Structure formats: C-alpha cells, structure tokens
Design a protein with these regions (language model features):
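Extreme N-terminal basic, low-complexity initiation segments
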Residues: 1-3
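Short helix-capping/linker segments at secondary-structure and domain boundaries
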Residues: 47-50, 70-78, 210-216, 282-286
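Nuclease catalytic cores
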Residues: 22, 26-77, 118, 122, ...
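A non-catalytic, helix-rich entry segment at domain boundaries
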Residues: 5, 65-153
Length: 306
C-alpha cells in the first residue's frame, strides 16, 4: 500500500475538504476516461462486494508468479548467464528450459490457462536474451515497483488542486538513455486498445518522474499480451503525457463538482459488466442511492412507486 494513503481517499467529496486529498490510480483514471465515470464513483463509495471473475483471478495469479520469476532470476544470475550464452549459440530450447526453471508452476482452478500465459512470457524472454550480454541486461531494474507522488493539478474554475497519485508498474528495464516501462496484460488485445495503453503508460511515466524514485528518464514503454501473442515496445511520447494530464484534470473536476456521468446512449452494453447498477442514477428508483447503500431511509424519485 502507498505510504501516503492515510492522507488521501478515492471516495473524496467536498465535505471532506482539506482533511484528505483526492487519490488517483492508473485504474481510476482509465475507468473514468475509457469506461464509465459513474461506475468508477460508485465503486469507491458503495459498500458493494465486487463479483469474483475468472479473468481477475487469472490476472492476479500470473502477475504474482511473474514477479517471483524475475526475483528468482535476480537470485540466480548464473542461470540467466547460461541462458544468454545459449541464446547466442542459437540453443533456444535450452534457453527456454533454463528460464522455465525459474518460473513457478501454475496451480489451482485455472492452472491450464495461467500456465499458457506464463509459458508465453518465457518464450518472449528467450527472444530478449539474444540482445543481452550479461544478466543485468535481461533483468528489470524494478519489479512491481510501488509509487506515490503528491502533485498539483490545474483545474478549470478551481485553480491548483493537490492530489495523491498511486501506481504500481509491473516492470522497468534499462535502456541506453534511460528506462523502459513494461506492462503485463492477461486479457485480449485489439488495435483499438492502443490509445488506451499509451494513456496508461503515460500515467506511469508521469508518476515515476514526479516520485522520489530515480531510475532515469522514461525513453520507451510497452506491453505484453500473452493470450493474444502480442507485444509492443514504443518510444515514449510527451504528447501522450500531456493528453493524460488533461484527463487527470477532468477527473479532479468531477470530484470537486460531484459530477460523474453515466454511460452515454449507445454504450449501455457496459452496464452488463457493472456490479453497481442498483445504485446507478440511470436505473435506481432512489433519489439518494448512495445513502441507501449505507443504511439511510430511501427517498424515491418522483413517479416511482414505493
């Protein structure tokens, strides 16, 4: 957990005022900008237990084992060096076996699907080995790095607002002139996700830059989608960070005005994936759904039968 969490909250309202700051993560900004603003807000203020989904369990397990895989690699540099030497000799099968020995086996209800993701990660890393000379070239300089930062955001009509940014970056690798951020995604890939992924990485690059960590400038960012056999590594662009900051300012303004829009017409399909429809202004019969969720007496909207 972030060291600054006690002084901030995702469920900030104007009544809280200066007692706490607005807290923002990559996920909250992404949900606000690319999915449903109201769902984001309800997920922070309603005491509703989110449903367990297989894809969330798979993602969590694969992330945990991938983190351990790189920890094991750092603890066994001789294995990494052996794999690098074999990569230069074209012994891909041996490279795979060496790296695979460092990766914890998948287990549990979704073991087969999780193992498919993990085996792809090893095959992808075999390709990376061919560009390495020593273990330090292969291993990340940061593995599941936890970041916090306090920044001031200029909000139209409200001036500068101090907020708390949170972030956990899957992996950070060294480049010639700085570092590259790399995310692991166990979901599906589609080209329409490219702007979204750039936005996520821009957020991480910004948080890393303004945090206390000194890993160097972010020169590249990328992502790996094992399920889709897809990965990218792109040059980091300032324009993406500028666009992300504008979305961040809009999110903060929504907090200040307590104004989180429901999905627009034509995007109602998103509601089928929501655990908070009973509290949503688009569907609820209550004028005070959040208060009802927290035990208050219901106030019905005009025209609704009690």
């Amino acid at each position: 957990m972030g060291v600054l969490n006690e002084g901030s909250t995702y469920s900030w309202t104007p009544i809280i005022g200066d007692d706490k700051m607005i807290r923002v993560s990559k996920s909250t900004l992404d949900s606000y900008s690319n999915w449903c603003q109201q769902q984001l807000w309800l997920s922070k203020v309603c005491p509703q237990e989110e449903q367990t989904h297989d894809y969330l369990t798979i993602g969590s397990n694969v992330h945990d084992r991938t983190e351990q895989y790189y920890i094991n690699g750092a603890d066994s540099p001789e294995v990494i060096q052996d794999a690098i030497d074999n990569a230069h000799l074209g012994n891909d099968k041996k490279c795979y076996e060496l790296l695979r020995s460092l990766f914890p086996d998948a287990e549990g209800e979704y073991a087969d699907r999780e193992q498919d993701n993990q085996d792809w990660m090893v095959r992808n890393d075999v390709r990376r080995l061919k560009h390495c000379v020593k273990p330090e070239d292969f291993l990340p300089v940061a593995n599941e790095i936890d970041l916090d930062a306090i920044v001031e955001v200029e909000v139209e009509g409200y001036g500068k607002q101090q907020i708390h940014l949170r972030g956990i970056i899957d992996r950070v690798f060294k480049t010639e002139d700085g570092v590259a951020l790399m995310e692991l995604k166990t979901g599906k890939w589609n080209t329409y996700k490219l702007p979204q992924m750039k936005g996520e990485m821009a957020y991480y690059a910004y948080v890393l830059d303004v945090s206390d960590n000194d890993l160097g400038p972010v020169t590249h960012w990328g992502w790996r989608f094992p399920k889709a056999d897809h990965w990218d590594i792109l040059e980091a662009k300032k324009v993406s960070i500028t666009a992300m900051k504008k979305r961040l300012a809009k999110l903060v303004k929504s907090y200040l005005e307590e104004d989180f829009a429901t999905v627009p017409k034509g995007q109602e399909f998103k509601c089928g994936f929501c655990d908070y429809m009973s509290f949503c202004p688009k569907y609820t019969p209550y004028a005070n759904p959040i208060e009802v969720a927290n035990g208050a007496e219901a106030i019905y909207l005009e025209g609704d039968v009690q």
